């Protein structure tokens, strides 16, 4: 990975349950450790983990050349509202922008919805008479006298941090910078954040929220970094402390202290970098990065060995994992979807008798019931303990001793009893005659509790599969032909099931999977993405203006990177574009070299091509807009050595087995157990099997096999299924996608998924689990329809207020499932309009691919400008 002359380096990832520490030795191999996260003082777990790993390796801290840190401190401060006392100064007339929000509602069916409160209360928001226009012109001169009055009130108000956000400052920052000058004259020690520096992008709601968030956490992060650096120096560290930012690059501690909002979502970024590295090593050009830890599961797409990036994301959601319920942050980030599906995610049965998993988590304290640290809630980890995937003898995380009894008690109380499961009616098939070879102190085969555990596992698997499908659609991608990289403590337990559900050929489980994000930190380049909104259209393109913006962004990004390294750098440029009238942009890469009139002309063609890739068709004759520009400068990373795929050999004979519930068989079966440390390149393990190591366990499902690759990565695929690219390895190791396309939404059927028919296994109550999974998948299908409509809409009410609905109906016109995104009022009109189509045309006359459309209010569309479209499938 690096020249062997380099010294050891350390990566530290603070998660919701565990703090992971990875040490890279000079030869490029890794040592690692997990310690429980200390939420009140996160540096305690960081320092304890570093001390433990260097002591075990016999390395003095002063020999370590880099310490790279990803922290949730900024995220937690925003969630828990425990940042600095902060004021917002904005343009007169725009005091309430962060409170009035947008028209979007994250829960359309909640009449008593409580919108997230603004980060800064109204009494702490001040205004200055001034106004910059959308093209940077001064519409109202900056009122110095009024500004000095605001400064005096800020000084007297006891604030420790100030956010400044004036209208259109991304085009002309003079007024914001002048206010900072006045404030520093009066209070030099007061922290100040300017929106023109933190997030120079259009859309004032998002920009103002971003600068408020930066100001709110700035004193906290600056203090934390000072304390951590001081303690590291006291321990003997002589190297710099570097931070990973949400865009997946490294930044100096000084830069992080100035722009701490860029640290939000820094941990998950490390995981995506880790997956991208594996893509290079194993010559896979398209990867699904699957990171499942103790609290959440994160899914990202890797293309051409690089993670996809976005310009905005949400944090501090009040309705966790519901889009629109949080605070928008407009800074570059690795694009991913995050759901409450971790090992510590809590399972329960709702009022409808359905198993729900997450988003609440048992966290590190008290943790899952099986940790025997006082937790009583049933979790995904407890389910894996009960069905035999996790075993006390091979669970080495942080020295925790698993209690199978506590896991069983929690599952029975939270899931089994509410569903009416009992040993007398359960039909899991405990296979009581099967014996283990050697002592087995795992969970006994209790059919009722097994049924509860299998139900929890099935639901969390389906939740993650639906999240992956949704993320792919939002990105305009089809997962056919992708591979998966699974890491995080819980991902290897669920990866086999996930690739089967998604129609993915294979999953790679790398060495160090349990601490993948921390290793990813050590693979990250110094990087910074500078962004700015600058409006240009295909009708009147300002080439010189764009050229100037790109030069300024390049200089800004290079300056930040040079704060941390003198290495050679690369530059990438991108613009967000749309059709005039739309409100959602797609990214278009810019060519290298000077931006001139020829490049401007080529930009239109590049946008049309990108739009067709996203949505299937372009729209002729419309004006195209370029709205936001970005330049990313990164240090050059060493190209890793690739490995050739290892062929499968004869499956190894198991040294030991234990009874583990097999979802395909619907019962417990003798399952081979292998210690990963004993496996060598070329070894083949046939499922059902478990491959154990200190920080995770890999499940090789029945009908699958794992082959150990040259770098000791496990490649798992269905038995006899070659990787799509192995038959034809094209030049440049681009994969040959020759296998048949699969439906991304194939539904469970009696012939296709016997495991889903039997996996709940116990009585009428547990037979509802596969029906619940099928319904969830239908919801995922129509949610994709709704999201695509929002993204392509020219109607403000559709894209901002969700003035739409999407659903699936049976032959008689009864709705089976509807999208979460949408307006309740359209549901009934949609059903009535469909009834009109059925009555007028007849179901037997309809054919797949037909399209029926009406805007007739008398056929229940509601208004002339409302349209109902139906397509038979």
Regions found by a protein language model. Name each.
Residues 4-6, 14, 145-149, 153, ...:
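C-terminal, non-catalytic interaction/recognition modules in large multi-subunit enzymes and RNPs
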Residues 71, 165-167, 195-197, 246-247, ...:
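Glycine-rich beta-strand-to-loop/alpha-helix junction loops that act as flexible
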Residues 1-87, 133, 140-162, 176-181, ...:
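N-terminal glycine/serine-rich phosphate-binding loop of ATP-dependent small-molecule kinases
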Residues 11-14, 18-22, 31-45, 49-51, ...:
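Conserved phosphate-binding loops in N-terminal lobes of ATP-dependent enzymes
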Residues 13, 87-92, 127-129, 165, ...:
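Short beta-strand segments
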Residues 24, 33-40, 87-93, 113-115, ...:
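Glycine-rich phosphate-binding loop of actin/hexokinase-like ATP-binding domains
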Residues 206-217, 261:
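Glycine-rich tight-turn/loop motif centered on a GG-T
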Residues 185-208, 503-519:
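Conserved phosphate-binding/catalytic loops in two-lobed NTP-binding clefts
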């Amino acid at each position: 990975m690096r020249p062997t002359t380099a010294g050891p380096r350390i990566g530290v990832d603070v998660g919701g349950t565990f703090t992971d520490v990875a040490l890279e030795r000079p030869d490029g191999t890794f040592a690692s450790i997990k310690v429980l996260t200390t939420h009140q003082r996160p540096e305690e777990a960081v320092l304890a983990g570093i001390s433990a790993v260097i002591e075990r390796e016999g390395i003095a801290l002063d020999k370590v050349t880099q310490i790279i840190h990803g922290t949730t401190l900024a995220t937690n401060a925003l969630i828990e509202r425990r940042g600095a006392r902060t004021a917002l100064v904005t343009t007169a007339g725009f005091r309430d922008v962060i409170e009035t929000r947008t028209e979007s509602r994250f829960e359309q069916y909640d009449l008593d919805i409580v919108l997230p409160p603004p980060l800064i209360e109204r009494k702490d928001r001040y205004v200055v008479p001034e106004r910059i226009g959308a093209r940077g012109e001064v519409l109202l001169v900056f009122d110095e006298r009024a500004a000095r009055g605001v400064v005096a009130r800020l000084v007297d108000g006891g604030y420790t941090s100030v956010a400044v956000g004036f209208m259109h400052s991304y085009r002309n920052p003079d007024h914001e910078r002048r206010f900072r000058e006045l404030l520093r004259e009066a209070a030099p020690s007061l922290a100040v954040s300017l929106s023109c520096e933190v997030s120079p992008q259009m859309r004032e709601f998002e920009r103002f929220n971003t600068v408020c968030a930066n100001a709110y956490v700035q004193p906290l992060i600056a203090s934390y970094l000072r304390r951590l650096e001081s303690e590291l120096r006291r321990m003997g560290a002589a190297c710099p402390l570097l931070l990973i930012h949400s865009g997946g690059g490294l930044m100096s501690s000084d830069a992080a202290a100035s722009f701490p909002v860029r640290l939000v979502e820094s941990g998950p970024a490390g995981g995506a970098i880790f997956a991208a590295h594996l893509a290079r090593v194993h010559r896979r050009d398209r990867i699904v990065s699957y990171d499942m830890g103790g609290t959440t599961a994160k899914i990202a797409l890797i293309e051409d060995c690089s993670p996809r990036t976005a310009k905005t994301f949400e944090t501090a959601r009040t309705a966790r994992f519901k889009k629109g319920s949080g605070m928008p942050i407009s800074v570059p980030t690795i694009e991913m979807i995050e759901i409450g599906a971790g090992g510590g995610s809590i399972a329960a049965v709702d009022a409808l008798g359905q198993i729900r998993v997450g988003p609440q988590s048992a966290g590190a304290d008290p943790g899952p019931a099986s940790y025997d640290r006082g937790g009583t809630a049933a979790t995904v980890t407890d389910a894996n303990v009960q069905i035999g995937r996790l075993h006390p003898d091979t669970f080495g995380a942080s020295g925790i001793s698993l209690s199978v009894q506590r896991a069983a008690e929690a599952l029975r109380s939270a899931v089994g009893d509410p569903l009416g499961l009992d040993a007398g009616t359960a039909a899991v098939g405990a296979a009581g005659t099967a014996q283990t070879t050697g002592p087995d102190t795992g969970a006994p085969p209790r059919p009722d509790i097994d049924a509860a555990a299998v139900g929890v596992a099935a639901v969390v698997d389906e939740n993650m599969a639906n999240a992956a499908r949704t993320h792919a659609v939002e990105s305009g991608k089809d997962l056919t032909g992708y591979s998966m990289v699974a890491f995080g403590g819980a991902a290897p337990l669920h990866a086999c099931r996930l690739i089967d559900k998604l129609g993915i050929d294979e999953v790679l489980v790398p060495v160090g999977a349990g601490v993948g994000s921390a290793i990813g930190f050590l693979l990250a380049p110094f990087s910074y993405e500078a962004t700015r909104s600058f409006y240009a259209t295909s009708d009147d393109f300002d080439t010189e203006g764009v050229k100037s913006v790109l030069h300024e962004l390049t200089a800004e990004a290079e300056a930040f990177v040079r704060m941390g390294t003198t290495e050679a750098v690369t530059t990438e440029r991108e613009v967000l574009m749309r059709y005039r009238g739309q409100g959602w942009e797609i990214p278009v890469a810019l060519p290298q070299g000077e931006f001139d009139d020829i490049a401007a002309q080529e930009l239109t063609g590049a946008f049309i091509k990108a739009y067709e890739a996203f949505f299937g068709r372009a729209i002729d004759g419309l004006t195209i807009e370029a709205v936001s520009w970005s330049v990313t400068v990164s240090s050059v990373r060493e190209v890793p050595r690739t490995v050739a795929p290892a062929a499968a050999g004869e499956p190894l004979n198991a040294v030991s087995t234990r009874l583990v519930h097999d979802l395909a068989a619907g019962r417990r079966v003798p399952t081979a157990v292998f210690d990963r440390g004993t496996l060598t390149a070329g070894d083949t393990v046939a499922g059902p099997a478990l491959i154990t190591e200190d920080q995770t366990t890999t499940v090789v499902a029945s009908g699958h096999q794992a082959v150990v690759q040259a770098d000791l990565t496990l490649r798992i695929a269905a038995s006899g299924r070659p990787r799509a690219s192995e038959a034809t390895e094209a030049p440049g190791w681009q994969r040959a996608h020759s296998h048949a396309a699969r439906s991304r939404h194939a539904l469970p059927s009696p012939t296709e998924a016997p495991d889903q028919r039997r996996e709940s296994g116990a009585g009428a109550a547990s037979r509802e689990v596969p029906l619940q999974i099928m319904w969830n998948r239908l919801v995922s299908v129509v949610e994709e329809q709704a999201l695509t409509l929002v993204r392509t809409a020219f109607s403000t009410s559709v894209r901002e207020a969700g003035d739409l609905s999407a659903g699936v109906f049976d032959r008689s016109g009864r709705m089976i499932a509807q999208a979460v995104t949408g307006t309740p009022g359209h549901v009934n009109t949609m059903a009535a309009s469909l009834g009109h189509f059925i009555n007028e045309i007849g179901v037997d006359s309809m054919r797949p691919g037909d399209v029926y459309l009406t805007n007739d209010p008398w056929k229940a569309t509601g208004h002339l400008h409302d349209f109902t479209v139906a397509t038979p499938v």
